[in-house]
Amino acid sequence: ELILLSAAGILFIIQLIYYFGLYNRIHARNKAVRKEEVHFSRELPPLSVILCARNEAENLRKILPAILEQDYPQFEVIVINDASTDETEDILGMMEEKYPHLYHSFTPDSARYISHKKLALTLGIKASKHDWLVFTETNCMPASKDWLRLMARNFTSQTQVVLGYSGYDRTKGWLHKRV
């Protein structure tokens, strides 16, 4: 019985070492990819970045410069104002003067019997000039100025969808405790 318990303990320790080693390799690789400079030799397709905003004035003030100043040859940013009651419209107008590749529109207040988010996305898609569309949220900050390049490097003629993710930053507050 003692031999079986010892063998199980040894196997458990070996398994833990394996999992920690595997996790550390994945973590180190992801860290290296984030730090490396991105250089691409092939031509990058023009992109349309689409955001929907409903009362997101503070987030737009932070995220739009990070998106609009991406190191990418040709792209446009389309923000659909979804019936905001805060300063969203003012911020979009001010930033549109500074950034010529920023465009914005709005969803009508009278829209009923349809999801406002779906309507806003549809309007953004219809307003886009380019075939490749990138969707993001107003609370997802790009990790670097190469964010669009990193997304576009996976585009091929056979590609239909490229997915990315945004890590979750834990902050204080009751809402974040629930997540």
Where are these regions (language model features)?
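Cell-envelope/extracellular polymer assembly enzymes that use nucleotide-activated donors
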Residues: P45-S48, E76
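Short aromatic/hydrophobic "clamp" motif used to bind/position activated sugar donors
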Residues: L121, L133
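Conserved donor NDP-sugar-binding/catalytic core segment of glycosyltransferases
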Residues: K145-L175
